[in-house]
Amino acid sequence: MYEFIKPNYKDNNIVNLMSSISNSFWKKHEYNTLKSLGSEELDSFENIVLIVVDWLGYNYLKRQENSFLLKNLDSKLTSTFLSTTPCANTVFQTGYPPQQHGLTGWTANIKEVGGITRILPFTSISGEETLSNTGFNINKIMDIDSLHNGFNWKCFTIIEEKKSKRDFIKYVAKETKIIAAKTYKDIFIELKELIKSKSKERRFIHAYMDEFDSIQHFNGVNCDKTNLLFKDIDREIQALAESAKGTNTKLIVVSDHGMIDHTKESQLWLKDIPGLEECLTIPITGEPRVVDCFVRPRKVKDFKKIMETTMSKYCWYFPWEQLINDNFYGLGEVNKKLFDRVGDYVLIMKDNYVLRDTLEAYVWEVIPQKAAHWACSDDEMLVPLVIIDCN
């Protein structure tokens, strides 16, 4: 029915991985455990270490011959819809996909704060000041528990220092000890020390690094800078595995999404598409490759005509209820906030096209991006599952 990859929330998604981890720490999870790594395979380990390398796509890793990570590759998983950090990385912190956590992209129409919001830094679309400084509480937009609430053992979050201070991280990691690190190399130093330290309890340690994502956005997927950074991260993980020998630790390396290259020619601007802006009640939200469109009722016919003519080369478009009913955002009970945040129509971009609005992306006119994610190609949607036992 669809010409792209849908998330497999039944048994082969990052959500199912978190179900396996949750069940191993005696917390019931509403989704099935992962087909390739059940909770019983985790139960005997003293330390479960989850290393999330933002952007490390499955297809990219398969091209890295002789790498330590490729040698320890177990299988491939699907990301969430959208294949983006706010939607997918939040899974590693809450255990659940957008259907439950309610986040729909880097920007979203957040009724609780009365406007378009950048979720992770918790700022308005037009400013850098955190909304908490103006009286808004992130608890009002996040009504899901952290994954760690109810775990019977110690939990740790290791993350880059600036991000550790965000309201979002303080909310989703509030049941953990947050350890701030200056760089990804410092994250590995903290991991080595923590794993080697003695503990009377089992531990779940979640480390997140995003340098790989940042460098590719501005340099491209297969450029020298990207490949050099991968090789260094690969060496660091190999050294960590060597250091952890004899500690009864299971290292799990995964990602939130992959990435594809795009060019200046594949970048579309809302202002350049005749009639489209006039159809919308508010600016586009979501991500540049999965776009939420809130359409004026009297302009629905015009909007559909534009989609089926001018835009048909560049994207598919779907009514919101189709994507929710077809389980793009997850399974089970739907977070009511999702209905406010998903557009009346959702555009999923074809090939390597992106659609931008100058309101949310003015910076990219000055510093163009060379790679993107967010949508449903196999490069974006498939992520690796790497498993290393350190007995």
Where are these regions (language model features)?
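Feature captures the catalytic ectodomains and active-site-proximal regions of enzymes
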Residues: 1-391
